[in-house]
Amino acid sequence: MGQKINPIGLRLGINRTWDSRWFAGKNEYGKLLHEDVKIREILHKELKQAAVARIVIERPHKKCRVTIHSARPGVVIGKKGADIDKLRKKVADITSSDVVINIVEIRKPELDATLVAESIAQQLERRVAFRRAMKRAVQSAMRLGAEGIRINCSGRLGGAEIARMEWYREGRVPLHTLRADIDYGVATAFTTFGTCGVKVWIFKGEILEHDPMAQDKRMAESDGGGSSRPRRDAA
């Protein structure tokens, strides 16, 4: 089953935690869940060029704290913070809570599975040879310290008449090992021949302690190998 299931969902509560971190009663839960979906849709639409990997939503008392993990924080903030103010207003229109937006910079986008998948998808849309795009992504990830990476591309690759799936793997990607820190990302390339799917698994080592927040702490604490700066409140 480890081969088929989403590796992030499999590890929730073990060494990964949820991207929506709040509790609500029966009457409020559905409403807040729909708000989360709308907030993510709007932010991904507005920040297409900002290389956004994750959006974490927390709801302390009468507040909505949105943390955007981006490889290009300058694009999110905009000139003198103008763009982030617009984003805050758009999010505030969806939710009745006070909105606070934080931005976390991803220092090594080559080690973030979502950003790697989106990068390959964009290259496929620009008609870059799919094998070259995949090999380049594999080499970059391994050079920057990944212990293993696997990339799947499927669809009418290179404009072929019959759709197929091709994959590359380097190093170890132990999908069955629950203590493995595996990042997973998907993206879709809309080419002139049809859609192509891209899936990326990146193995970053093992997390031995049983702590749902272990992966976030590891990202924040590791100096050279970490993928995030300390949080910066943009409110």
From Swiss-Prot:
GO cellular component, one term: cytosolic small ribosomal subunit
UniProt cross-references to InterPro entries, sorted A to Z: KH_dom (IPR004087), KH_dom-like_a/b (IPR015946), KH_dom_type_2 (IPR004044), KH_sf_prok-type (IPR009019), Ribosomal_S3_C_sf (IPR036419), Ribosomal_uS3_bac-typ (IPR005704), Ribosomal_uS3_C (IPR001351), Ribosomal_uS3_CS (IPR018280)
Keywords (A to Z) from UniProt: Ribonucleoprotein, Ribosomal protein, RNA-binding, rRNA-binding
PROSITE patterns: KH_TYPE_2, RIBOSOMAL_S3
Region Disordered, annotated ranges: 215-235
Start and end residues of each KH type-2 domain: 39-107
Listed GO MF terms: mRNA binding; rRNA binding; structural constituent of ribosome
GO BP term, pick one: translation
Family, similarity comment: Belongs to the universal ribosomal protein uS3 family.
Primary role: Binds the lower part of the 30S subunit head. Binds mRNA in the 70S ribosome, positioning it for translation.
Subunit structure: Part of the 30S ribosomal subunit. Forms a tight complex with proteins S10 and S14.
Protein name, per record: Small ribosomal subunit protein uS3
Species this protein is from: Rhodopseudomonas palustris (strain TIE-1)
Lineage start: Bacteria, Pseudomonadati, Pseudomonadota, Alphaproteobacteria, Hyphomicrobiales
Name of encoding gene: rpsC
